[in-house]
Design a protein with these regions (language model features):
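RNase H-like two-metal-ion nuclease catalytic core shared by retroviral integrases
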Residues: 19, 67-69, 73-79, 89-113, ...
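An active-site-proximal beta-strand-loop segment
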Residues: 1-36, 40, 180-181
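Residue-level signal for inorganic ion chemistry
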Residues: 30, 50, 68, 139, ...
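Charged alpha-helix within mobile-element recombinases
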Residues: 105-147, 191-194, 198-199
């Protein structure tokens, strides 16, 4: 069974232009996925794509999902798709969020972890989605299931997680520039800082200080000696 809940709208639009987060939790392993949305109306499309991926990539036989009664979950398009896939849809009773407690608790945990990260590193609110994604990625590989004493990652995949590539959120990095060179004098590396990891993999998400964009790379060297660079960076380039 999968538990799911939508949070938002967040007061600050993320640097990716998102205001909502869709959290999905596997009942057995407590492995968690989080997706970021511009608008609530995107929920059904993201949900359909995820359910197909989960059944193919993780070999999950999804029999049931549980959500609240929000219109993003309770609508004709979603119900027709679930009927086609033979997936049962349970709803929590109105005004009783405890009936969707697994997803609600995970939401609170991710948000509280993100707030702590923001307080520690004085992070711009525009990076909230990147921070939530990072806390979700870390929790899947670091926290033990209270009964089974294994991480969600191991329970889902059967493999122990490799956390050797984890770095301090916001740490300075130097990234190999593999883009086509506009001139012979184009820099071979660019400076940025770490914002997290991509799709539960070892691909880094970094903020390119020159372009003001979030980019993904496997070719980065990190300097964690000076802590987070997020609080030291002039965010005018992000906000403009």
């Amino acid at each position: 069974m999968l538990h799911m809940d939508l949070f938002g709208p967040i007061a600050y639009i993320s640097i990716g232009g998102n205001k909502y987060g869709l959290v999905i939790v596997d009942d057995y392993s407590r492995f968690t996925w989080v997706f970021f949305l511009h608008d609530k109306s995107e929920t059904q499309g993201v949900l359909k794509k995820f359910l197909r991926r989960a059944q193919n990539e993780f070999n999950l036989r999804i029999k049931k999902i549980r959500s609240d009664n929000g219109s993003e979950f309770k609508n004709t398009q979603v119900e027709e798709y679930l009927d086609e896939e033979d997936i049962k849809h349970e709803f929590s009773a109105p005004y009783t969020p405890q009936q969707n407690g697994v997803a609600e608790r995970k939401n609170r945990t991710l948000i509280e972890m993100t707030k702590s990260m923001f307080d520690e590193y004085k992070t711009s609110d525009r990076f909230w989605a990147e921070a939530v994604n990072t806390t979700c990625h870390a929790s899947n590989s670091l926290y033990l299931h209270h009964l089974l004493k294994k991480t969600p990652y191991e329970l889902l995949t059967g493999n122990k997680p490799n956390v050797s590539y984890f770095c301090v959120f916001g740490s300075k990095c130097f990234v190999l520039n593999k883009k086509p060179k506009s001139s012979k004098f184009a820099p071979k590396v660019y400076e940025g800082f770490l914002l997290g990891y991509d799709s539960n993999s070892r691909v880094y998400r970094v903020f390119n200080k020159d372009s003001g964009c979030v980019e993904t790379t496997c070719d980065a060297m990190f300097d964690e000696t000076n802590g987070s660079q997020v609080e030291q960076f002039d965010l005018d380039i992000v906000d403009n």
